[in-house]
């Protein structure tokens, strides 16, 4: 019997791409979100590919709320 690894919360995203002024996030459920890079500046987070983000509130209008996520917790 195979045991599947547990998926992280649907609110935990990984930065998969940074292009122009858009940061693309993807979670374990294959949901993708695009966030403007200035939103990271507003929250004092430096976007880096591979960094984990806890997406608290997503807003397409540019008012998303998120924080860095420590995968070791």
UniProtKB/Swiss-Prot annotation:
Domain of life: Bacteria
Protein name from the UniProt record: Uncharacterized protein UU179
């Amino acid at each position: 019997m195979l045991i599947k690894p547990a998926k992280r919360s649907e609110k935990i995203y990984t930065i998969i791409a940074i292009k122009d002024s858009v940061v693309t996030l993807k979670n374990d459920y294959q949901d993708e979100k695009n966030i403007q890079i200035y939103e990271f500046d507003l929250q004092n987070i430096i976007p880096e590919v591979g960094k984990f983000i806890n997406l608290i509130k997503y807003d397409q209008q540019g008012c998303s709320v998120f924080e860095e996520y420590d995968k070791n917790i």
